[in-house]
Amino acid sequence: MTTSTRGAHRTPAVLVLEDGRIFRGRAYGAVGATFGEAVFSTGMTGYQETLTDPSYHRQVVVMTAPHVGNTGINDEDMESRRIWVSGYVVRDPARVPSNWRSTRSLDQELAAQGVVGISGIDTRALTRHLRERGAMRVGIFSGNALPDEGTMLAEVRQTPEMSGADLSAEVATTEAYVVPAIGEKKFTVAAVDLGIKGMTPHRMAERGIEVHVLPATATVDDVYAVEPDGVFFSNGPGDPATADHPVSVMQGVLERGTPLFGICFGNQILGRALGFGTFKLKYGHRGINQPVQDRTTGKVEVTAHNHGFAVDAPLDQVSDTPYGRAEVSHVCLNDNVVEGLQLLDRPAFSVQYHPEAAAGPHDAAYLFDRFVNLMEGQRA
């Protein structure tokens, strides 16, 4: 529920966690009430890309950077058609942006899209609380006549948890569309949209790939109707344990031996397709400064992450799967979480992080080239 935003920055707001911890501040964006899973992002920049990343659907994002909104909002850096976060939490927002590309303030954009936020709270204390207690349900309430604390806490505890949530179909396209190759067309890729970011097909298009973006409900027949040279499974929100349909489609692709690449949720789908389990991380990886090691080369990359679940695969051995041998290709150096998988007997691999770098470092851009190399090898 959201209401008017006029004078919102003077309106009281309360953030209520499901364990009873309460933070008081001022409204930011729309005024009203919102609910979701409280998570924190450590990125110092890229807030516009974060807000419009469909993987954040049904999450209330806490920004650890103290100043947010300095460069306003523009029409070029959107990663999807709308803001997907359920709520937004900042310490010290910039009310007057300063950037030559800015067309409006972040506050105005949040208000226009009905996103309830809160400002002026101790985001460092909140982040530490989430790090120690784990991601949890949360509510943001703002207005001049707020309910009592007991009522607000009861409302938070009635909201659904992220575990068991099947959300891809809520954010994915409902109609297939094509992103044309930039320059000479070299390959055709079928991209299954589980919550795809706009920069991902663009990175492929830069490499001469015509990308056919398909709904999350696409079947194996739909995938092969576009006569793809490769198949891609995107990022997306929710619990991978619920994603039985994408897993089935990926297994059909693996059976045919078509080159396959997955990112983020796509990595978890590959893990499940190979017979591995998935699990929920305590507080997840979200930000643009996460160190990951490529175990093939030993190289360490600084990467962009947004995931609250991970694949449960052995780090110290090659695993036998229905599609041949598989191994963990990348690990996070902070906590040894699986950050990539690759098949040794078929042209298929995936990573848990975001090589499209929107926002974030470009250390992992080579993964798109690796996908191209797999498709070239299949033609040879």
Swiss-Prot record:
- Disulfide bond sites: none
A GO molecular function assigned to this protein is: ATP binding
Q: In which pathway does it act?
A: Amino-acid biosynthesis; L-arginine biosynthesis; carbamoyl phosphate from bicarbonate: step 1/1; Pyrimidine metabolism; UMP biosynthesis via de novo pathway; (S)-dihydroorotate from bicarbonate: step 1/3
Residue positions annotated to bind L-glutamine are: S55, G236, G238, F265, Q268, N306, G308, F309
Q: Which CDD domains does this UniProt record tie to the protein?
A: GATase1_CPSase (cd01744)
Origin: domain of life: Bacteria
- Domain Glutamine amidotransferase type-1, first and last residues per copy: 188-380
Reaction(s) catalysed by this chain, per the record, are:
hydrogencarbonate + L-glutamine + 2 ATP + H2O = carbamoyl phosphate + L-glutamate + 2 ADP + phosphate + 2 H(+)
Q: Which residues form the active site?
A: C264, H354, E356
Which keywords fit this entry according to its UniProt record?
Answer: Amino-acid biosynthesis, Arginine biosynthesis, ATP-binding, Glutamine amidotransferase, Ligase, Nucleotide-binding, Pyrimidine biosynthesis
Asked if the keyword Iron belongs to this entry, the reply reads: no
GO biological process, alphabetically ordered: 'de novo' pyrimidine nucleobase biosynthetic process; 'de novo' UMP biosynthetic process; glutamine metabolic process; L-arginine biosynthetic process
* Keyword check for Lipoprotein: no
Q: Which terms in the GO cellular component ontology are assigned? A: carbamoyl-phosphate synthase complex; cytoplasm
List the residue ranges of the region (CPSase): 1-184
Q: InterPro entries, per this entry?
A: Anth_synth/Amidotransfase (IPR050472), CarbamoylP_synth_ssu (IPR006274), CarbamoylP_synth_ssu_N (IPR002474), CarbP_synth_ssu_N_sf (IPR036480), Class_I_gatase-like (IPR029062), CPSase_GATase1 (IPR035686), GATASE (IPR017926)
E.C. number, please?
6.3.5.5
**Which family does the record claim for this protein?**
Belongs to the CarA family.
Q: What is the role of this chain? A: Small subunit of the glutamine-dependent carbamoyl phosphate synthetase (CPSase). CPSase catalyzes the formation of carbamoyl phosphate from the ammonia moiety of glutamine, carbonate, and phosphate donated by ATP, constituting the first step of 2 biosynthetic pathways, one leading to arginine and/or urea and the other to pyrimidine nucleotides. The small subunit (glutamine amidotransferase) binds and cleaves glutamine to supply the large subunit with the substrate ammonia.
Partners and quaternary state? Composed of two chains; the small (or glutamine) chain promotes the hydrolysis of glutamine to ammonia, which is used by the large (or ammonia) chain to synthesize carbamoyl phosphate. Tetramer of heterodimers (alpha,beta)4.
Protein name stated in the entry = Carbamoyl phosphate synthase small chain
Species: Streptomyces coelicolor (strain ATCC BAA-471 / A3(2) / M145)
Lineage of this protein's species? Answer: Bacteria, Bacillati, Actinomycetota, Actinomycetes, Kitasatosporales
